């Protein structure tokens, strides 16, 4: 992951609920699309993590872990806002997300009129389950027409499910894609009873 530096919370070893972690590259105008980079705000490096009512924001690779080794990590998120634009929840860990806001990061000057296609997830083989979550935008640049996908593969056997989620018109009709040719055929991608107001 690029543009990685410590937040104040990490410097003082703070963990808990009701945190706000916003990954910003020092000296960069992060509302400008040209500064979009991979930058973890929350990196999974432990088992049995529980996160409640936290705001976890960045652009790409906001929440997750890089690498292909499956260490059997498990995480639970409830009532959180998790934001980004590209694969902003990604990597090899199993997770359940209940009642979370999945927030598209918007940019003031991207080349597609602030409607840059993004991907919420890029899972490996461990499943991500989203229940009663809502897809939103950050609203930073007005009410723009963001249209993205639930996710894309990150290798064979990617696994993600969205159950009874509200997409607010921010997910395109295809819903899913792949990072490399042929991976989608072995992916386990599910949608159940989602709404699109």
Regions found by a protein language model. Name each.
Residues 1-197:
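Sequence-level preference for short, compositionally simple segments enriched
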């Amino acid at each position: 992951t690029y543009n990685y530096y410590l937040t104040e919370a990490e410097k003082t070893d703070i963990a808990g609920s009701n945190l706000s972690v916003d990954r910003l590259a020092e000296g960069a105008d992060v509302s400008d699309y040209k500064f979009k980079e991979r930058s973890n705000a929350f990196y999974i490096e432990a088992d049995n993590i529980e996160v409640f009512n936290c705001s976890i924001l960045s652009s790409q690779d906001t929440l997750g872990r890089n690498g292909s080794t499956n260490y059997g990590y498990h995480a639970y998120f409830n009532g959180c806002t998790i934001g980004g634009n590209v694969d902003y929840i990604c990597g090899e860990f199993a997770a359940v997300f209940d009642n979370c806001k999945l927030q598209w990061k918007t940019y003031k000057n991207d080349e597609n009129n602030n409607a840059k296609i993004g991907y919420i997830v890029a899972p490996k083989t461990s499943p991500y389950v989203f229940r009663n979550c809502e897809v939103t935008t950050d609203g930073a640049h007005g009410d723009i027409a963001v249209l993205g996908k639930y996710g894309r593969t990150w290798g064979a056997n990617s696994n993600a499910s969205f159950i009874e989620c509200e997409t607010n018109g921010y997910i395109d009709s295809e819903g899913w894609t792949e990072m490399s040719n042929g991976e989608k055929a072995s992916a386990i991608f599910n949608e159940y009873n989602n709404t699109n107001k």
